Amino acid sequence: MNRLILIGLVLCSYNVRCQTIVSSVQEALELAHRSNPELRNAQQNRQAQEQQRRATRAPLLPQARFFTNFDYNYALPVQLVPAEFLGGQPGEFRSLRFGLPYVLASGVEVTVPVINRPARADQGITEQNLRITDNQMLVLQDEISTQTARLYHATLLTRSAISLTQKNLSAADTLTQIARDRLDKGIIEPLEYNRIRAVQLTTADVLYQNELAYVRNLNQLKLLLGLAPSDSLMLSEDLANRPAGGPVPASDLPRLERPQVTLEQSRVELSKRQLNRERLQRWPTLSAYGRFTEQAQRNAFNFLSTNQPWYQIGVAGLQFNWPIYSGGLRTSNITRARLQLKAAETALAYERNKQQTDNEDIRNTYNQAIRSLDLNRQNYELSRQNVQIALIKYRSGLFAYDQYLNVFNEALTAQNRYLNNLSNVFINQTILQIRNGQ
């Protein structure tokens, strides 16, 4: 018995843990910012790209390395010298061999950069690339916020549509039952009954389609919120109870720079830094170096012998490099960087105009939806009352079926218009709030 109770408690706690209740679109946006897989992946990539700072800083720091070389001189250089220098006869020559066949050298080398302007420019380019990555994350967050707002309201819209369609189906069922009774009594013809029955079937099919759309929207919303398909997501808000704001004047358009524009601005700055870096390639570089080497030369492979000498070589100096001619490569790179800068500036101007147009379009859509909302709500209430009145009249025989059908179709049109209008109001209102940083 205790084991069954324990299992029940575990199952209950699992169900509670997997159920997510969202009461507002702001909660949905906060959850998406915390748990969206794409955002989390972008944050991890940002941390990985942070290591690029160390990679670009390395050429400006001292470098040290240990090295060892083994050479086998299978053909040593030979020089002819007069034999008289070696005690021979004048006019004769002796051949002298230079070096030994087996050479082993090992040592340490340290290099310290003194002047390297292109490498310092690379640091600025790396920092700018990291800023671009941050701006790309802001663009991704903005896109996910917009998608979340649209899917959140689409889910509420389809849920409301299901509720209204269920009421329509209930009225169609009642009408079909009345028509069936009249058909059995011979009051109406089979044609009228079949038409009523067809409306009932069509309404049932619309209900199934709305239920499918609701499930799809809910699953897509789970995906954006970082939930598994098996997790439970409950939206407790009712759009009809949320207060709608007033029209938004043009002066209240979002003043914050859109992330898309900021991203293009950072790309323009990157192009400027890259152009400057290509120009710095003309500057010379200066580095100091020191090298210490121990070398052994043998006639046989006996380097482990302690009786043979090792020779020490030490050197320190400065290396100055000034590129004079590179076959036109520097000029080509500078020209390419200039063209990339112009392309980035063009993209920035286009993106700024695009975002301004988009903001204006959202504002106009929202204002139009606000103006139409009250009219559509009144129209919906009137059409709902008309359906009830028409059903009573049809039941009492005062209305023909065609008259009732006209009223019913008008009610369907009013319902769809009201739901779409309500959804447009809150979707565009939420998007404007997101773009205002609220």
Name every feature range the model reports, one short phrase each.
Residues R40-Q44, R57, P101, V114-Q141, ...:
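Sec/SRP-type N-terminal targeting helices
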Residues V16-N69, A75, P229, L235-Q274, ...:
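Bacterial Sec-pathway N-terminal export signals of envelope proteins
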Residues E27, M137, Q141-R255, T365, ...:
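Periplasmic alpha-helical coiled-coil/stalk elements that build and connect Gram-negative outer-membrane
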Residues M1-V25, V425, G437:
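Bacterial Sec-dependent N-terminal signal peptides
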Residues A58, D205-L227, Y380-Q438:
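Short segments within alpha-helical structural elements
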Residues T20, F67-V108, D238-G245, G290-W322:
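Small/polar, glycine/serine/threonine/aspartate-rich low-complexity segments that form flexible
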Residues F67-N73, T111-P113, T158, N168, ...:
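Outer-membrane beta-barrel pore domains and translocons
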